[in-house]
Amino acid sequence: MNDFKDKVVYQIYPKSFMDSNGDGFGDLKGVTAKLDYLADLGVDYLWLTPFFPSPQRDNGYDVADYRAVDPRYGTMEDLEELIREADRRGIGLMLDMVFNHTSTEHEWFKKALAGDKKYQDYYIFKDGTPDCCPTNWVSKFGGPAWEYVPWLGKWYLHLYDVMQADLNWENPAVREEMADILRFWKAKGIKGFRFDVINVISKPEVYEDDFEGDGRRFYTDGRNVHKYLKELVAAGGIDGMITVGEMSSTTLENCIDYTAEGNHELTMCFNFHHLKVDYKDGQKWELREPDYLAMKKLFQTWQEGMQAHGGWNALFWCNHDQPRAVSRFGSDTTYWKESAEMLAVAIHFMRGTPYIYQGEELGMTNPHFTKIEQYRDVESLNYYRILREQDKTEAETLDIIAQRSRDDSRTPMQWDASENAGFTTGAPWIGIADNYKAINAAAQMDAPDSIRSFYKTLVALRKKMPVISAGKIEFLYPDNADLLAYRRYDGETELLVLCNLREREIAKPLPVGWTDAEKLLGNYPDTADTLRPYECVVLKK
C-alpha cells in the first residue's frame, strides 16, 4: 500500500530559505528555526536539496562527499537537531541524492585523475586523442559532454557540467557505494529520498554518435535502469520509504514501471513534460506562449495512464530548476492572487502526491532581473554566452534568461517586509525580488484570504477527503483550450474541478447533474455563471 497518497511534501532550497548567522547563505539552523511555520502549513515531509560538501559549481548538485554537511550549511549536529525537531512535529526529512555524477572534487575522482585504475572504473573514461571526442553528445548545460585529461590520454563523460563527472553504474562497486550512502542516512533518521536525474544512470554498451539529437536517446531510461533501481532500493534498505525520482525526458510507460507498487523501485516520479509547453520547437531557451491544450493532454495522458496501470505521480509546478509558476502560467501583476490559487487547485486535486516549493505558498514571483551580473546559475551564464553567439541582442537574451533561468526560483524566501525580506542580516548570496515588501510570509500568516491560507486549506482537504488522495480521476472538455476540468470520484463522493487558464472571462460548462452541487472551494468570494479571469471552483456532491 502506498502510504503517501494523502501526504504533502514541501521542498526547501536551503541556500535561499533562512540564514541563521548573517553570512548571506541559508543554512540548516535556519530551516530548524522555521519548522513551526512549516508545521502550521500542515506538510508531512521536507525535501532538502543538497547541503553536502561541494565546490558549488552547480549549487550543490556537484557533491564532493555524500556523508557530510558542507560547513556553509552548518554541522552534522545541526542536521541531527533538525531531524529531531522535525520529527517532534510529525515531519519527516527527505534528502536529495545526486547519484548520476559526483563533483570532480570528490575523493574518488581525484584518485581516478591520479591514475588509480580502481577509481577510474568508478567513472566513464574513454581512451582518445585531444582532437576527437568519443561521441558528439551534448552536455545538458551546453557544449560537449566529454572532457579530455591530457596526462591520462582519456576523456571522461559529463552529461551536466564539466565538473560533474558521470558515475559508472555498470561497476558493482559503485552500486554498493550508493546503497551504503542510503543506509548511512537512514540510520541518521532520514525518512525519504529524492533521486536526481536517476533515469540517466544506465549508459549504453556501445558509445556512438547521435546524428538525430544530443545523445539523450542512448542513455535516457537506459537498458539496466530498472535493475539498478530495484537493487539500490533493496540493498539500501529503503523499500517502503517515500522515494521520488527526477526523470529527465522520460516516458509514461517507464514511469509506470518505476512506481508500480509491486516493482519495488520508487514510490513516485517527477516528469517535466507539462513544463515544456512554452518551449518553442522544444527548445528551453526559445520563448512562446504556453500551449494549454498540449498541457491538458499531457495531464490527462499521465494521470489516466498512471491510474490504469498502478503508477503514481508527483504533482508540481515549481522547483529549484523552474521559473515561478505564477509568473509563467499566471499573472504576477493584475491577477496575482487569483492565478496563484488557480494553479494550486489545478494540481492539488489531481491523483498523486503534491509538492510545494518554498515561497510558492506565498505566490512568490520571478525576480525579473535585468542584468547578467545578477545571475548565479551556471546554466544561465552558459546560455547567455551561447545566445549572444547566436546573434541575439543583449535585450533579447536578457528577456529569455529572465523568463527561463533557474535563478527565478532561487531568490531568497520572503519572510517579512524588513531589509533583505528577513532572510539574512548580511548581504544575500543572490538578489531578492523587489516585491518582497508586499509578498511575504508575515503579511499572509494570519490573513484568512491569503494565498498561504488557501494552500493550508488544500493540504488539510487532502488529509480529510479520501476522494482526493485515493479516488479515481476523469478529465472533461479535452478540446477546450481555456479550461482545465476533471472529476474525482470514489463511490461515495464526487468532486468537479474547474480552472480557467486565461486572463479573461470564459464560459462555465457544467456536466449534467452538477447545477445544484455544493461549492467546496473557490478563489473568488462569490459565485458567477461564467468563470472569471483565472477563476477556479471545486464542486462537491
What does each of the following model-derived ranges do?
Residues 46, 193-195:
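Hydrophobic residues within beta-strands of alpha/beta enzymes
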Residues 2-183, 187, 200-253, 261, ...:
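Acidic/aromatic-lined carbohydrate-recognition and catalytic surfaces
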Residues 54-58, 101-108, 201-204, 251-255, ...:
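Short catalytic/ligand-binding loop motif for oxyanion handling, primarily in non-cytosolic enzymes
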Residues 505-522:
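Beta-strand-rich binding/interaction modules
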Residues 4-5, 216-217, 227-229, 233-236, ...:
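Loop/helix patches that line or flank the sugar-binding groove of alpha-linked glycan CAZymes
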Residues 526-541:
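C-terminal beta-strand-rich structural cap/linker in extracellular carbohydrate-active enzymes
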